[in-house]
Amino acid sequence: GDNGTIVKSTDKGLSFDNVTTPTSNTLLGVGFGNNTFVAVGISGNIVESNDNGTTWDNATSPTANYLRGIVFGNNTFVAVGDSGNIVRSDNGSSFDNVTSPVTTHLIGVGFGNSTFVAVGDNGTIVRSTTDNGSNWDNATSPTTNNLYGVSFGNNAFVAVGDNGTIVRSTDNGSTWDNVTSPTSNFLIGVGFGYNTFVAAGTYGNILRSTDNGSSWDNATSPTPNQLRGVGF
């Protein structure tokens, strides 16, 4: 979070404690893989923990651009950010720049079926297949609305964004279709678990889909506040 804030829970999320962090820069995303947590944020900041989030160190970052999202897949961390920046690492401690096909801001990144997918401003969607995030191509996007989050489940990618936008791909992120949304509120995060996609956003809006993202319904939300992420 803000000012390098990192908090940790060891009781299944019942209570959290502050953790000492090596940065005062705002951190915007966190991922986990190979027994390593990696968090990314403004000014290209990347920090890592190899002891279940108890202690953190700065990782080597090749960029000063904001990094807004990170995911782990195929033994690789991939983070994305402003100006189309994409960075990758095999260990979480040292990252390298990857050639990006776009210069628009990338905000969210997901992984599934050996494919990385990143989404961002103006409906931008890019993907990397079979080479652990080393090479990226543009995907066909059906929207010009900003996209903020992307998730994979049951052989489908789902991305969400401005004005209730929901788009879906069933061919490893190559082509995408608009999906009817029950809201015009901005959707910021999306996650998958128990055969269900859940999206959340402004005004406490929560949506769910139980048919691989093909149709969506409003869920009962206990808050009018903005929701920025969904995890499972």
Regions inferred by a protein language model and the residue ranges of each:
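Residue-level hotspots at or immediately adjacent to binding/recognition sites across diverse folds
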Residues: 1-232
